[in-house]
Regions:
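N-terminal leader/targeting and accessory segments in enzymes
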Residues: 1-84, 88, 277, 297-298
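Adenine nucleotide phosphate-binding catalytic loops in nucleotide-utilizing enzymes
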Residues: 13-14, 195-202, 206, 216, ...
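Short, hydrophobic beta-strand segments that form beta-sheet elements in well-ordered domains
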Residues: 16-21, 53-60, 168-170, 217-221, ...
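Short acidic, glycine/proline-rich loop/turn micro-motifs
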Residues: 18, 137-141, 274
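Structural motif
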Residues: 31-34, 58, 168-170, 183, ...
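Short, conserved catalytic or interaction motifs in soluble domains
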Residues: 37, 189, 311
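Short, ordered loop/turn segments at secondary-structure junctions
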Residues: 61-63, 130-131, 187, 244
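Phosphate-binding loop of NTP-binding sites
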Residues: 80-222, 226-236, 265, 286, ...
Length: 334
């Protein structure tokens, strides 16, 4: 709970119980943000929000009518204000845990879940993805394709209360969340109906890395040459790299059946085996290992962590069975 003048530069001091961008969930003494989305314009639901108890309306378009006893705050961009206010309302939870964001066209889920699984051997971890949220015994389906900012900040706040120390997050929209480590997997021509061109798509992915402060880490895939060249000179944080074809801090050499390979970390070379299939999964594993370096794990612990890496259910998953043929389950993008 916050007072309205803690969230906005206003003279009023009434208490705010909750914040919403969906009028169906608005309750007494709440703020309703009129987000103008791709398919729904929140300005059309002001009447519903006020009827259900909203005490403040944040809007950006001209209004024909304003209800008495309701505070109306006009802003240039409602979504930007929602991202800012949600972070404040829930007491900046992402600054209180180690936040690891994973972005790219594919591999986000696999890398984020692998990191969560590995780090769970050392500290209490949480995970926020496109499918669900997991932390401290809580498993909840995510009702959005991309976790909506209020939903995400509320759960991050709950993680802090439950003493979670680190979070891996699949990143599509990142405003309002502070990241310590950002990982890039790959980029290809997806969602060009939204971004328009490959250049705009890469610029959208690159924004995350420019927001990491000097103490943080950007982890880039050197095999994605165009994106690497776009980002490497624009960041202000530490840079770590991984790759198979191009020189990097962490590399896989002499790959055998996409299961065994020589792991090169700087000048150290070790033969390792991981239970994953596919060349792309070797790249995912390298991203996970590089994140361990960013967390400044001792080298022996980094090598130990390789033994904790497991494949993700349904993602090039090899099923064990007694019959004379191979069964692989792969039901969606990686």
């Amino acid at each position: 709970m916050k007072r309205i003048n803690e969230l906005f530069d206003v003279e009023e001091e009434f208490k705010v119980v909750s914040i919403h961008s969906d009028s169906r969930y608005v309750g007494k003494d709440s703020i309703f943000f009129c987000v103008d989305g791709l398919s729904v314009d929140g300005h059309k639901y002001i009447e519903d929000a006020v009827f259900q108890g909203a005490k403040c309306i944040v809007y950006s378009k001209p209004l024909a009518y304003k209800h008495r006893g309701v505070l109306y705050i006009k802003v240039n961009n409602v979504l930007d204000e929602l991202n800012r206010v949600a972070d404040v309302f829930y007491d900046h939870p992402s600054y209180k845990m180690t936040m690891i964001g994973v972005t790219g066209s594919s591999g986000k889920t696999v890398v984020a879940l692998m990191i969560k699984e590995v780090l769970s051997h050392y500290l209490k971890m949480g995970y926020i993805g496109t499918n669900n949220i997991e932390y401290a015994g809580v498993i909840e389906q995510c009702p959005y394709t991309t976790p909506e900012t209020i939903f995400m900040q509320r759960h991050l706040n709950d993680m802090v209360k439950r003493d979670v120390k680190g979070v891996t997050l699949e990143v599509s929209s990142h405003d309002g969340v502070h990241f310590d480590i950002a990982i890039f997997t790959n980029v290809y021509e997806e969602h060009l109906d939204f971004h328009g061109t490959m250049e705009h798509l890469m610029a959208s992915k690159a924004k995350l890395f420019t927001l990491i402060d000097e103490k943080g880490y950007a982890i880039l895939n050197t095999d994605e040459v165009r994106f690497y060249n776009l980002v490497k000179d624009s960041i202000r944080c530490h840079l770590l790299t991984y790759g198979i074809e191009h020189k990097a801090h962490v590399m896989a050499r002499n790959i055998q059946l996409f299961i065994e390979f020589d792991l090169q970390i700087h000048d150290d070379l070790r033969h390792v085996s991981v239970p994953v299939l596919g060349r792309f999964n070797i790249s995912n594993v390298l991203a996970v290992i590089t994140s361990m370096l960013a967390l400044e794990m001792p080298m022996d612990q980094v090598l130990e962590s390789v033994g904790y890496i497991r494949g993700v259910d349904g993602r090039m998953e090899l099923l064990e069975h007694p019959y004379p043929f191979t069964v692989i389950v792969d039901y969606c993008q990686h």
